[in-house]
């Protein structure tokens, strides 16, 4: 008869300083299907090491071990995990149940790694628990069970994927005599069903119940009676689970890993919440700075645009400070007419200015008098608190009318409710007040100079007696490139004058400078927020490393029941990503609250959350989880199952 498990000259040694300590010394052993074998020996004799090799948790240093004719030395880690999953079931002295899972969920774990569908797993687990008398304890947690009940759950878990070979390590060692007898009775039933049962024990009474007792001493077998040949094995072994394959198995495995990750996080709610806190603050900082910063930028740019940033000023001469007399009369009224006809011009206004005295009754103040057209106020986005601007008739007739700014009104008419219709002296010319203009506040501060505006025809003909213009201001239509407009304006006037005796000043440059400055500031603030996100990510990595250390035994249990290294890696990586995603969602919610709160106090701000900002937040959360969860997950996947199971 061909042995199910065949060991030939198995040796296992471990490094101890500069030396190698040999624990198993040339073990040769055959175990046949359906046998109930006890391996006995004193502590330190090597029986546990032998069991680990039999269960494919460990590999021999030398020698040959075959399972159903397959040499395990040729198998990689994943193939060994599959072998454990499909052929072996472990029963541990301390039960090794996962405390955050219910009885039913503990029993299902091996089938999860086998890829069995949820419904089939549930039915199989319920069937096994019913057979072992635990049908009324399926929703209990291990801490709510007695030792005997926990060991029966461990047996059910060992049988979940079929359990062709049952490896029981001191199965009664932590139980009272009655519970121990119940467990041994169950093991006898399994033997009768065709399972191969291998018991590792130091208790002679337990060993005596086996058909064959193998004694090991100092790493060598000192007693190995021949196997009792079995003609017929009653019942046959448990049915091996049928797994799904391909894409469905991948999706099912991922869903189960996600579920297990969620359960693990829920088991330590406070620690999970504190871990999330760093991510919440980081994501909220990034999103808030991006969104609120963009709203602030748009608010600033809107304010700048409202004071005439899409304007081009034309001055005579070569550059600022050029007072060469030959350029003084370069700009004419005909130039203004030609400019106004261009398709890209929204409005254009001339300017003729001089500093004059203003007088009303006994009030005498200095002011800057500016001759402009009626479009001037539209060009600079100015509004009227009283009256209105000049009309064409007043421009054509050189009417003696004037518009005051709010500061001039306050100086000349401190106690009057309505000043429209009042007459003041502008220089020596009487002028009737037709309006009060409200100037937009500039971010660069306001001038202390009082300002009044007259029709440019009045200013040129009646006040100054000149026929040329000091400057022309052009407002470019929305949507038209300001730089292109400046080039066309330069070409137009150069052709008209036959030379370039003027220069331009494009206020769009100010806008671009402000935009660049706000972008730089926003980038700086975003980097600060990203640093907080990185700190949060480091917190996640730290907690996950602690979690791996705390859950080392759990990792060993999962590997013993068939989890591959990739399964462990996936689970811990999903846990890290899940922490970051939930933290990210809460961070986005917090940033929404911050934005809405700001909008209550700053109603002029238009704060909006673009899908791109939310997508970036989601991607940041995922990337943080993957980046900072990789190291802990990799450490977990690299654990040796034997060492992991031995950890307290």
UniProtKB/Swiss-Prot annotation:
Cellular component, GO annotation: plasma membrane
Residues passing through the membrane, by range: 273-293, 523-543, 576-596, 600-620
Residues annotated for ATP binding in this entry: 41-48
EC number: 7.6.2.-
InterPro entries linked: AAA+_ATPase, ABC3_permease_C, ABC_transporter-like_ATP-bd, ABC_transporter-like_CS, MacB-like_ATP-bd, MacB_PCD, Macrolide_Exporter_MacB, P-loop_NTPase
EC class: translocase
Broad class of where this protein is predominantly found: membrane
Matching Pfam families: ABC_tran, FtsX, MacB_PCD
Subcellular location(s) per record: Cell inner membrane
Record keywords, A-Z: Antibiotic resistance, ATP-binding, Cell inner membrane, Cell membrane, Membrane, Nucleotide-binding, Translocase, Transmembrane, Transmembrane helix, Transport
Domain ABC transporter: 5-243
Molecular function terms from GO: ATP binding; ATP hydrolysis activity; transmembrane transporter activity
Membrane protein topology class: Multi-pass membrane protein
Signal peptide span: none
Flavoprotein as UniProt keyword: no
GO biological process: response to antibiotic
Entry similarity comment: Belongs to the ABC transporter superfamily. Macrolide exporter (TC 3.A.1.122) family.
Function: Part of the tripartite efflux system MacAB-TolC. MacB is a non-canonical ABC transporter that contains transmembrane domains (TMD), which form a pore in the inner membrane, and an ATP-binding domain (NBD), which is responsible for energy generation. Confers resistance against macrolides.
PANTHER family: MACROLIDE EXPORT ATP-BINDING_PERMEASE PROTEIN MACB (PTHR30572:SF7), MEMBRANE COMPONENT OF TRANSPORTER-RELATED (PTHR30572)
Binding partners and assembly: Homodimer. Part of the tripartite efflux system MacAB-TolC, which is composed of an inner membrane transporter, MacB, a periplasmic membrane fusion protein, MacA, and an outer membrane component, TolC. The complex forms a large protein conduit and can translocate molecules across both the inner and outer membranes. Interacts with MacA.
Protein name: Macrolide export ATP-binding/permease protein MacB
Organism: Shigella flexneri
Higher taxonomy: Bacteria, Pseudomonadati, Pseudomonadota, Gammaproteobacteria, Enterobacterales
Gene that encodes the chain: macB
């Amino acid at each position: 008869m061909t042995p199910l498990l065949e060991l030939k000259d198995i040796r296992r040694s471990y490094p101890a300083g500069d030396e190698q300590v040999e624990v198993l010394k040339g073990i040769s052993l055959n175990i046949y299907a359906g046998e109930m074998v006890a391996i006995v020996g004193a502590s330190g004799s090597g029986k546990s090491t032998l069991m680990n090799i039999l269960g494919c948790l460990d590999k021999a240093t030398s020698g040959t071990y075959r399972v159903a004719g397959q040499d395990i030395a040729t198998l990689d880690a994943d193939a060994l995990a599959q072998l454990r999953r499909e052929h072996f079931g472990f029963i541990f002295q301390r039960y090794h149940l996962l405390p955050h899972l219910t009885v039913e969920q503990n029993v299902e774990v091996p089938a999860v790694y086998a890829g069995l569908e949820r419904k089939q797993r549930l039915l199989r687990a319920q069937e096994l628990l019913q057979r072992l008398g635990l049908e009324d304890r399926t929703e209990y947690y291990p801490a709510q069970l007695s030792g005997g009940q926990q060991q029966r759950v461990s047996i059910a878990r060992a049988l979940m994927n079929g359990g062709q070979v049952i490896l029981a390590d001191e199965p009664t060692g932590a139980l009272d005599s009655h519970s121990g007898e119940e467990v041994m009775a169950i093991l006898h039933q399994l033997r009768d069903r065709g399972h191969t049962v291998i018991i590792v024990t130091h208790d002679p009474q337990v060993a005596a119940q086996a058909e064959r007792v193998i004694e090991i001493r100092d790493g060598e077998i000192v007693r190995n009676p021949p196997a009792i040949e079995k003609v017929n094995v009653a019942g046959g072994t448990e049915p091996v689970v049928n797994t799904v394959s391909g894409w469905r198995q991948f999706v099912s495995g991922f869903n189960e890993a996600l579920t297990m990750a969620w359960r693990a996080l829920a088991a330590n709610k406070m620690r999970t919440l504190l871990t999330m806190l760093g991510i919440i603050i980081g994501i909220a900082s990034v999103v808030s700075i991006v969104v609120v910063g963009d709203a602030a930028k748009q608010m600033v740019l809107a304010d700048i645009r409202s004071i005439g940033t899409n304007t081009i000023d034309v001055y005579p001469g070569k550059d600022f400070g050029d007072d060469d007399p030959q350029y003084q009369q370069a700009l004419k009224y005909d130039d203004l007419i030609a400019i106004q006809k261009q398709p890209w011009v929204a409005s254009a206004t001339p300017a003729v200015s001089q500093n004059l005295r203003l007088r009303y009754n006994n009030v005498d103040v200095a002011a800057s008098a500016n001759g402009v057209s009626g479009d001037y106020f539209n060009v600079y986005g100015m509004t009227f608190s009283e009256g209105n601007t000049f009309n064409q008739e007043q421009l054509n007739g050189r009417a003696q009318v004037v518009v005051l700014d709010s500061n001039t009104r306050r100086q000349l008419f401190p106690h009057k409710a309505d000043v429209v219709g009042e007459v003041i002296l502008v220089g020596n010319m009487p002028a009737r007040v037709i309006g009060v203009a409200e100037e937009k506040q500039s971010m660069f501060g306001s001038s202390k100079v009082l300002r009044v505006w007259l029709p440019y025809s009045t200013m040129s003909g009646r006040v100054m007696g000149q026929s040329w213009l000091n400057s022309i201001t052009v407002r470019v239509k929305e949507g038209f490139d300001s730089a292109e407009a400046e080039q066309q304006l330069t070409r137009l006037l150069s052709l008209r004058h036959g030379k370039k005796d003027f220069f331009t000043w494009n206020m769009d440059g100010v806008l671009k400078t402000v935009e660049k400055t706000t972008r730089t500031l926003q980038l700086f603030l975003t980097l600060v927020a990203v640093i907080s996100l990185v700190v949060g990510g480091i917190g996640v990595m730290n907690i996950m490393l602690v979690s791996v250390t705390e859950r080392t035994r759990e990792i060993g249990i999962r590997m013993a029941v068939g989890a591959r290294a990739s399964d462990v890696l996936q689970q811990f990586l999903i846990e890290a990503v899940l922490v970051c995603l939930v933290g990210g969602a809460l961070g986005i919610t917090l940033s929404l609250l911050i934005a809405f709160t700001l909008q209550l106090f700053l109603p002029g701000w238009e704060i909006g959350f673009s899908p791109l900002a939310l997508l970036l937040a989601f991607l940041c959360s995922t990337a943080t989880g993957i980046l900072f969860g990789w190291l802990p997950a990799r450490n977990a996947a690299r654990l040796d199952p034997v060492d992991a199971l031995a950890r307290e």
